[in-house]
From Swiss-Prot:
InterPro entries: Na/Glc_symporter_sf, Na/Pro_symporter, Na/solute_symporter, Sodium:Solute_Symporter. Keywords: Amino-acid transport, Cell membrane, Ion transport, Membrane, Sodium, Sodium transport, Symport, Transmembrane, Transmembrane helix, Transport. It is found in: Cell membrane. GO terms for molecular function: L-proline transmembrane transporter activity; proline:sodium symporter activity; sodium ion binding. Catalyzes the sodium-dependent uptake of extracellular L-proline. The gene is putP. GO terms for cellular component: plasma membrane. It is a multi-pass membrane protein. This is Sodium/proline symporter. GO terms for biological process: proline transport. It comes from Staphylococcus epidermidis (strain ATCC 35984 / DSM 28319 / BCRC 17069 / CCUG 31568 / BM 3577 / RP62A).
Length: 511
């Protein structure tokens, strides 16, 4: 019987090639960070949004890489390995959600954020869209971003720590710090341009990795007959419905609802050169996502047979990709595949750090400093943005220092928080002329509160009744939709010019 350490020791301990690949990967990221620093950090819009000059292909892979994170390479394969094919309902929901997002949200958001005061953050857009002169919605939505993204970012650091602990035998905390130092460097100095370029680069690496590992695993095992072997081990392994419930399927499928309100994803739509380039971005982005998720499912399924055949004791299912990549491949290739995991983790961390930083700077600091001074203090705002990156990273690292949950659960909680608070509001903002400031604030707060209450007090009751175990985005999203609608209907309608802006957006998008 092998332990995880035994399975990896012969592959890594004496193979400097693996380390070389990781070091080369880190050097490339640092170079891109320096390039971003030289090219586009002169003002806050450039630092936070790339000056709205990003092309469709970088937009597509940047959105995909920052979306999928370590979850696609570590979380999803581990889930499929543990529960079988029934885990793929989440991938169906996510793919549909992402596809609809490109059609429903992307074009209007790109146009509307520019028309509505050239907003560079989601809270700033809400404020301008609803003519909130008191900045109440800007402050509340900014707080939601800071709280949930700190939680979300810490899940990425947990993934990085786990990677170095599992693959290299390093102390978890040492691995966490290595990832933190690199990602903070290129985000701190390079801003949005560096983050987008590194995301594109990392997205390519991730895709290659997710295609390579399951194909080589099949060749090493029993070809297509491997799936017959997997079914023989446990009938539920290849059954979409067995081993789960209707409520479980609905919960997994409902992850797709979160796409419309994820700031680190939809900010990509805000930064593209023109809304007319979004179809190109959509075709590449959805294709990348579909192939990557299929690969992750393939890793999980082939891993069932692979681990069993080699009598490996897999202590943590989320390390499945690491184990397979290091046993199946030459150390040089293994190093590349480990870099793919780092790519998945770091692309998301950098995006989340930047969005949180932009919220702290644009939605809080500039508010305190005084918007009338904004044009003459761009360097100051960029500096505050950089310091905010550092501050959020330190807080997230502190929380991640003592991990006590799985990557999937950590991501799930934050995803639900944004999905319930922002998804309905984004959709209402882009399509409904009767949305009011009071309705928006009430619905947003209600969605976030329901998610927090459900996670903290309702979900633990699932042992009594399975209904309480449903994914928290469902009740949060429903409550947010209803509260926003009801309160908007009961309060004063928006001014005419707000409605005129909405009509202008519709006209521009149709051109």
């Amino acid at each position: 019987m092998f332990t995880l350490g035994t399975a990896l020791s012969n592959q890594i301990d004496a193979n400097w090639q693996t380390y070389v690949m990781i070091i080369v990967y880190f050097i490339i990221l640092l170079i891109i960070g320096f390039y971003g620093y030289r090219q586009a950090t002169g003002n806050l819009s450039e630092f936070m949004l790339g000056g709205r000059s990003i092309g469709p292909y970088i937009t597509a892979l940047s959105a995909g890489a920052s979306d999928m994170s370590g979850w696609m390479i570590m979380g999803l394969p581990g889930s499929v390995y543990s529960t079988g094919l029934s885990a793929i309902w989440i991938t169906i929901g996510l793919t549909l959600g992402a596809y609809i997002n490109y059609f429903v949200v992307a074009p209007r958001l790109r146009v509307y954020t520019e028309i509505a005061g050239d907003a560079i953050t989601l809270p700033d857009f809400f404020k301008n869209r609803l003519d909130d002169k008191k900045n109440i919605i800007k402050i509340i939505s900014g707080l939601i971003i800071v709280v949930f993204f700190t939680l979300y970012t810490h899940s990425g650091f947990v993934s990085g720590g786990k990677l170095f602990e599992s693959a290299f035998g390093l102390n978890y905390h040492a691995g966490l710090l290595i990832v933190a130092i690199i990602v903070i460097f290129y985000t701190f100095f390079g801003g949005y341009l560096a983050v987008s370029i590194t995301d594109f680069f990392q997205g390519v690496i991730m895709l290659i990795a997710m295609v390579m590992v399951p194909i080589v695993a099949l060749l090493k095992l029993n070809g297509w007959d491997t799936f017959h072997d997997i079914a023989q081990m446990k009938p539920t392994n290849l059954d979409l419905f067995r081993g789960t419930t209707v409520l479980g399927i609905v919960s997994l499928f409902s992850w797709g609802l979160g796409y419309f309100g994820q700031p680190h994803i939809i900010v990509r739509f805000m930064s593209i050169k023109s809304h007319k380039l979004l179809p190109k971005a959509r075709r590449l982005g959805i294709s990348w996502m579909a192939v990557g998720l299929l690969g992750a499912i393939g890793v999980g399924l082939t891993g069932i047979s692979f681990i069993s055949e080699r009598h490996i004791k897999l202590e943590d299912p989320e390390t499945l990709f690491i184990v397979m990549s290091q046993i199946l491949f030459h150390p040089l290739v293994g190093g590349f595949l480990l870099a793919a995991i780092l790519a998945a983790i770091m692309s998301t961390i950098s995006s989340q750090l930047l969005v949180t930083s932009s919220s702290l700077t644009e939605d809080f600091y500039k508010l305190i400093r005084g918007s009338d001074k904004a044009s003459s203090h761009q360097k100051e705002f960029v500096l505050i943005g950089r310091l905010s990156v550092l501050l959020v990273a330190i807080v997230a690292i502190t929380i991640a220092w003592h991990p006590n949950d799985t990557i999937l659960n950590l991501v799930g909680n934050a995803w639900a928080g944004f999905g319930a608070a922002f998804s309905p509001l984004v959709l209402y903002s882009l399509y409904w002329k009767d949305l009011t400031r009071a309705g928006a604030i009430s619905g947003m707060v209600a969605g976030a509160v329901v998610v927090i209450v459900w996670i903290s007090w309702i979900k633990p009751l699932a042992t009594i009744n399975a209904f309480f175990g449903m994914y928290e985005i469902i009740p949060g999203f429903i409550v947010s939709v209803l509260i926003t609608y009801i309160v908007s209907k009961l309060t004063k309608k928006p001014d005419d010019y707000v409605i005129e802006n909405l009509n202008k957006v519709k006209h521009v998008v149709k051109e």
